[in-house]
Structures are given as C-alpha cells and as structure tokens.
C-alpha cells in the first residue's frame, strides 16, 4: 500500500522572510516502511520568480537543484513525472556504473556519493531510490519541487533565456530565473531555445547510427543461488568464468542471451545484467530494441509495447535454457526506456574521444570521471564495441555551456560531448557530478551578474567555482596517465581512424597495431577512410583474405585513381609512386610497404588509411566531419 504524502512544498512565512521548500522549517518527512512509496503532490501556491530553474527530475537534475539550493539560490526543480529519479527509478536502471580509477579510487563524490551511500550503492532497491531522492530534495529549504510539470517552451529575450513555460494541471504556467539548467536527457530546453546540436553519430557522418534502447523488466521466482553459481562457474576448457557477482548484482548468460531468436527482427537479447531487489525480485537489463525514435513519445510507447509483446517468449526461453530462471515470472516492465543517445548539444568545449582515451586534464575542470567508451549494438551491428577504457579524465565547465544561448547550462548525456566521447561520459554519476558543478556555477553567475558563458571565459571565476565544489565533496584530483599505445609509432594514424568510430581497443586498450593485417581489416580501414571523406564508395576496395603489400596498394590505387579520374597504376612500383606523389606514403610508410611480397602490420595500415583520408579531403566535394581528427594538427 502506498502512503499519501503531501509534498511539503508550500511557501512558508517565517519572520517576514519567504522560504520555499520542504527542509528544516517543515516537519520531517515520514519514512515509509518496507516497500511503501512516498507519493508526491504539489503545493497549491507557488512563486513564479527564482534565482535558478532546473528542468527535469533526473538524477542529474536533482543534483543540480540541490547544489544550487545549498549554495543559497532560491531554486525551482521541474519534474515532468510523478516521481523523482528518471532513468534510475522510472527506467529501473539500478546497475550503477561507478567511475573508479585503475587503482580502485572513487572518482565521483559529492551529491552522487550521498545518494549512493544512502541506497547502498549499485543494485539499489527502486522504491528506496525514489524515496531517497525525494528526501534529499525535501531537506533543502531553498528548493521548490513541482511534479507532473511538463516543459513546453523557453522564455527568451533575444538570445538569452529568462525562464520557462510549463503545463501543470492543464494550465500553462510561466517561471522566471536568470539561470536555467537543462537536465532533460535529450536536451529539450536547449533544442527548443535553438542551441545547435548533432544527433547520434551525425558528427562523424553517422546520423542513422542509433544505439538500441533497453526495456528493463522485473522477474519473481528467480533462484538467486543458482544464478550466482552459474555466472561464477568456470566452463570446461576456460580459465575464467563468463560473469561475476557483487552483492545484489550478477552478470553473465551472454551465450544464452545471444542465442535467443526474437520474433521481432528489430530486437535482440544480450548478456544479462541482473540486480536483486529487497523483496527478492530481480531486474534485468538485457533486452535491446531497435527502430525506436527516442525523441518521439509515441515511438517510445510503441517500443515498450513491442518489448512487452516479446517478453512472454523470452521468459519461456529463459525457463528452458537459463539456469536459475526455471520458475521465473514476469512482474512488470519499467515505465520508461533506457535510451543511451539522442542529441549532442554544441557547447563551448566539446569533450572529444582523445580527451577521454588520453586521460586529459582540463584547466576549467568541474569533475573527474571514467567509463569504457561503450558503443552499444545497432540494428546493423549485432554486437556493440568498446573503443577503449580510460583511467581517468576531466570534464571542462565549457561542456556545460551551450553555444548561442545565454543564461543556460546543460547537464546529462546530451551535454557538450562528441558522440564517441559520450559513450563514456553519458553515465549518470558523471552527469550528477556535472549537475553539482552547474549548481555552484549558477550561484556565481547570480552573485556576479554574469552569464555561464562569461564565467567560462573568466579564469578567476573558474577557480572560485572549483574551490566550493571541492569543499562540498566534489573530487577534482586528477592523475595523469599516459596509455602505452600513445607511444606507438602509428598512434597518430590510429587517432584519426579512432575518431571516425572505427577502432576497437577493448577494455585493455589493445588495438593490435603490431599484428599482421588481414584482408578484411585492410579493406575496412581504407573503405572507411574513403566513406568518411564523402566521396563515392559504390565499389568497395577488395583484396584476398591474406594479401601482400602489392595486392593491397594496387587495389587501393585503382580505387583512388578512379575517384580522381586518372589512369590507375598497373604494377606495384607504379602504385607505390602513385601514393608517394600524393604524400599518402611518406618515407616511413614507404619502408613499411617496400616489400611487395610481404604483408604490412595493422599499424602501418592505420597510418595509410589516415593519410589517405587527409589526401582525399583535398578533392572537390570532400567532407570534413567536425569530430574527426587530422594529421596536420
């Protein structure tokens, strides 16, 4: 049974001072017992003018609002849902991706850690998380919460945002503030304010590269002891178990997941991330759904319906093939989909894939974090890929400052991250750290009568922001780490290809640069370079499975000659001269490909493809994508 709980958000008259919120001046919230959930309702009267407005009740938005309130700003938190927590609660994604360095050091503290400690870390109980988020908000005197409040449009004065218009109880209401923080997962406020953005992999020419979304589902009747025994069992002939267990978390069943054949072709089951709840139920993050337009509510609803239609077959399959799930029964699905990527807003500083994988520091750092660059499966690519795994990197305050519009900041997965960098930076703990920084920045902006953009360009202001951040628990100590691959002679070529989205270093950052190249790998590299230049790829470069240098250079020179409208070389010496003339082969690369009967290593082919790309950019109608590096820098 749910307890009806008044939100305690009324404006209180106290000694002539109006205090909005539900903190120390109000009765303490009653903590419900067991699985009982606090039900939030809005106060009947609320002010319309604030110092800071935060849009969305996501974890990132909650962190931003609490931070702004703690720093003395009269803050309004707008939540379109009836409960707080977004992806963590309504999406039921309770498998926290905890940013830790390779030495095991926690990288994100502050408000994120307060929440994590309160709910017991990763694998938290969903109802406990909802109540914890509410109580964290309720404790802040300066913070007013509005639930079931749907953002409609920004209020603009030229290129400056001055507030927002929302819909509450069927009525349009306007709220005003000098600083607005967009914490919506998709950057809805920024987009409505006409901040430029790219979609999915558009910044590298892959706008249609939409990672699948996930529908988390809850099962009862799962034998936890069998599950943990299964995922930790070392199969015969193997040296390690497929999965593992950590408290209420278990992961594994990859073979079983990928072996499932869905009735819906635009769907896939992968390995299971399993989280046990306080009542013994388990939550599963395993079902990938494609062909969902995550910016369209109707498409998202259809995606959930498709997932729910597939689940009876999935559960039958699990009962028959997955140890520990023999008596599993579906309880429910999450209210919202787990969406990994939509918009990437253009900000003053865009976090790049090299920032991430070279563990770079930032002068205006507002958090330190890490996570594998995890690009999940797409409809055309059955398996996802891990581009690399950083030790730790910093995020710039400029990544929270959208271009074109003043008075606005953005936190969450749609902030100023290029599409590949977002594969790492999109996780919620990182977003909560950015949210906390945005709250501190809002305080400085209000006190100094400056915009976030002006603060970004103010060195003294940045230092004034970093000091209170650290005092309030943020972790800004960064350890510079140079990855071994960065000293490889072919690393500059790898960087170019990696920034195109074609490099799989895995969790150990091993790009196999010294391996002898295979025919398919060579073709993938050079065809990618041609494709990314925007030139014709009607006929792909093809070679045998085990080509020698002569075969590779002749096949490639024939394609490039065709693109340029010139005669193709007819022998190995001619192909070598062809590429030397175009500076695709420099002195070092010429030596690597000098023996026509030998086969170059992968590093040489990465350099060849990168230099080919640079050459092709000189051709008419070539395209230079903004997120792709080049060798001339």
Which ranges hold each PLM region?
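Terminal recognition/anchoring or ligand-binding modules at protein termini
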Residues: 25, 499-633
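Conserved N-terminal/central alpha/beta ligand/cofactor-binding core
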Residues: 39-43, 47-49, 67, 73-74, ...
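Flavin (FAD/FMN)-binding glycine-rich loop and adjacent Rossmann-like elements that form
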Residues: 87, 172-173, 177-179, 187-463, ...
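Conserved beta-strand-loop-beta-strand element in the redox core of flavoprotein oxidoreductases
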Residues: 155-174
């Amino acid at each position: 049974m749910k307890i009806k709980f008044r939100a305690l958000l009324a404006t209180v008259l106290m000694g002539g001072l109006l205090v909005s919120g539900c903190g120390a001046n109000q009765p303490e919230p009653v903590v419900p017992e067991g699985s009982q959930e606090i039900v939030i309702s809005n106060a009947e009267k609320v002010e319309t003018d604030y110092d800071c407005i935060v849009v969305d009740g996501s974890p990132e938005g909650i962190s931003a609002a609490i931070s702004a309130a703690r720093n003395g700003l009269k803050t309004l938190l707008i939540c379109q849902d009836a409960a707080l927590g977004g992806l963590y609660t309504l999406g039921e994604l309770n498998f926290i991706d905890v940013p830790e360095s390779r030495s095991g050091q926690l990288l994100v503290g502050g408000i994120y850690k307060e929440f994590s400690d309160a709910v017991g870390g990763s694998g938290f109980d969903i109802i406990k998380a909802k109540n914890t988020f509410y109580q964290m908000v309720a404790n802040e005197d300066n913070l007013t919460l509005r639930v079931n409040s749907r953002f409609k449009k920004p209020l603009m004065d030229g290129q400056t945002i001055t507030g927002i218009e929302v819909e509450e109880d069927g009525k349009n209401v306007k709220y005003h503030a000098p600083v607005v923080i967009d914490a919506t997962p998709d950057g809805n406020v920024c987009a409505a304010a006409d901040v430029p953005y790219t979609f999915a992999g558009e910044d590298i020419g892959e706008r249609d590269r939409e990672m699948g979304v996930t529908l988390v589902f809850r099962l009862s009747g799962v034998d936890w002891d069998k599950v943990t025994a299964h995922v930790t069992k070392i199969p015969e002939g193997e040296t390690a178990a497929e999965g593992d267990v950590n408290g209420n978390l278990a992961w594994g069943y990859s073979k079983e997941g990928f072996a499932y054949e869905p009735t819906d072709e635009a769907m896939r089951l992968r390995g299971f991330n399993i989280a046990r709840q306080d009542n013994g139920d388990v939550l599963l993050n395993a079902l990938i759904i494609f062909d969902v337009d995550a910016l369209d509510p109707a498409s998202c609803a259809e995606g959930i319906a498709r997932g729910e239609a597939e689940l009876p077959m999935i559960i039958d399959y699990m009962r028959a093939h997955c140890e520990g799930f023999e008596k599993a029964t579906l309880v429910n699905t999450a209210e919202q989909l787990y969406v990994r990527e939509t918009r990437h807003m253009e900000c003053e500083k865009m976090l790049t894939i090299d920032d991430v994988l070279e563990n770079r520091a930032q002068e205006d750092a507002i958090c330190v974090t890490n996570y594998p660059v995890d690009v999940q499966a797409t409809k055309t690519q059955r398996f996802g890929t891990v581009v690399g795994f950083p030790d730790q990197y910093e995020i710039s305050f400029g990544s929270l400052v959208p271009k074109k519009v003043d008075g606005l900041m953005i936190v969450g997965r749609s902030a100023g991250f290029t599409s590949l960098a977002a594969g790492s930076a999109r996780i919620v703990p990182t977003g909560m750290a950015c949210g906390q920084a945005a709250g501190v920045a809002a305080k400085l902006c209000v006190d100094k009568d400056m915009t976030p953009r002006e603060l970004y360009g103010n060195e003294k202001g940045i230092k004034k922001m970093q000091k209170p951040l650290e005092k309030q628990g943020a972790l800004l100590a960064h350890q510079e780490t140079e990855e071994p691959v960065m000293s490889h002679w072919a690393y500059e070529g790898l960087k170019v290809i990696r920034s195109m989205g074609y490099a799989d270093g895995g969790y150990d950052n091993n790009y196999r640069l010294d391996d002898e190249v295979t025919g398919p790998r060579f073709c993938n590299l050079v065809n990618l370079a041609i494709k990314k230049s925007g030139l014709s790829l009607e006929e792909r470069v093809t070679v045998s499975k085990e080509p020698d240098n002569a075969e590779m250079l002749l096949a490639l020179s024939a394609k490039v000659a065709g693109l340029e409208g010139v005669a193709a070389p007819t022998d190995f010496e001619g192909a070598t001269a062809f590429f030397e003339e175009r500076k695709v082969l420099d002195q070092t690369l010429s030596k690597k490909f000098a023996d026509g009967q030998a086969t170059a290593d992968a590093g040489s082919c990465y350099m060849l493809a990168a230099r080919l790309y640079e050459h092709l950019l000189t051709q008419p109608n070539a395209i230079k994508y903004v997120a792709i590096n080049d060798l001339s820098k």
